[in-house]
Design a protein with these regions (language model features):
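Nucleotide and nucleotide-moiety/phosphate-recognizing core
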Residues: 36-128, 136-158
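Small-residue (G/A/S/T)-rich helix-start motifs and N-terminal tracts that mark the onset
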Residues: 1-80, 88, 182, 193-301
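Short, ordered loop/turn segments at secondary-structure junctions
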Residues: 81-84, 160-161, 188, 284-287
Length: 301
């Protein structure tokens, strides 16, 4: 699977809208349905949902999810942060739709924010900022993130934890980044998911396929890929019924040193695991008996 930049992800959205064709708000609704189904699979209706939505399209996703969860009899509370008095077009549409749901407790935050009580029975839906963020969170947004991080509530992030950038986080402020238990990434993973320092920020991540156009992804150049099961499966050829070890290649492994036989043993086992027919291993004399006893299939010299 190809990993593309946040800029290319935006272009992927635009390409899908133009070539499916589908409107931006309908594509957002499709994503919201996938997000909602996944949240419902992981957390039942005993959880009190608390949605934190930002002014952009990530916030629009969050508002749509809030509406859909409410329709499934979840208790939902929404905080929309609109400190500049301007929402994206899709966020505004989903706000209008949300207001038609009378069962949702809704607060629009423009200045002062009185945070709700958060316990382990509340599920925080993080929809403050998406992968397009290009600077660290500060001020009020950083304070909100710190408040949520200090709570005992599980957090599910929409697309990416708020405050985490899609690629380079060298100059980011780590204490101002949302720490998610689960991240529901739309269509493709973000490069920052694969850095060990972000493990406790991203948590467990799951990809949600919302039908973005794969032909665009194929045209984008990238240096980063993940290896998927389907790609490996195509490399494994069916074996003939009467085939024998002589039909599957003969490998030579030269490895090991005195007192450090582990790497040579693991390498030999890996060779055999790959399906090779015969394996000859050359090791130092001190490792000969150990190799022969632990990897009896190998021809040891």
């Amino acid at each position: 699977m190809k990993i593309i930049s946040s800029t290319h992800l935006k272009e992927l959205d635009k390409y899908t809208i133009a070539n499916e064709p589908i409107t931006s708000i309908d594509l957002m609704e499709r994503a919201a349905h996938e997000l909602t189904r996944t949240i419902m699979r992981r957390w039942d209706a005993s959880f009190h949902i608390v949605v934190f939505a930002g002014p952009g399209n990530n916030g629009g996703d969050a508002l749509a999810v809030a509406r859909l969860l409410s329709q499934q009899n979840y208790r939902v509370e929404v905080f929309l942060f609109n400190t500049k008095g301007k929402l994206s077009e899709e966020c505004q549409i989903n706000l209008n739709r949300l207001k038609e749901c009378g069962s949702i407790y809704f607060t629009e935050v423009s200045t002062k924010f009185d945070p709700p009580v958060l316990t382990e029975k509340h599920l925080v839906v993080d929809g403050l900022f998406g992968s397009g963020l290009n600077k660290p969170l500060n001020g009020g947004f950083a304070a909100v993130v710190k408040y949520i991080n200090a709570s005992k509530s599980p957090v599910v992030a929409i697309d990416i934890p708020s405050g985490l950038m899609g690629e380079d986080n060298t100059y980011n402020i780590r204490q101002n980044i949302m720490r998610a238990d689960v991240t529901l990434s739309i269509q493709l993973p973000k490069l920052s998911f694969f850095f060990p320092e972000n493990e406790d920020i991203v948590g467990e991540w799951e990809l949600l396929n919302i039908g973005l156009k794969t032909e665009f992804i194929e045209t984008v150049e990238s240096s980063f890929f993940t290896t998927e099961e389907v790609e490996i499966r195509n490399l494994i050829k069916p074996r003939k019924r009467f085939a024998h070890k002589g039909a599957f290649g003969h490998g030579l492994l030269i490895a090991g040193s005195y007192g450090m036989a582990g790497a040579s043993i693991l390498s030999a086992r890996a060779c055999l695991r790959s399906g090779i027919g015969l394996l000859t291993v050359h090791v130092p004399i001190h490792n000969h008996d150990l190799m022969q006893s632990t990897v009896p299939e190998a021809i040891v010299h």
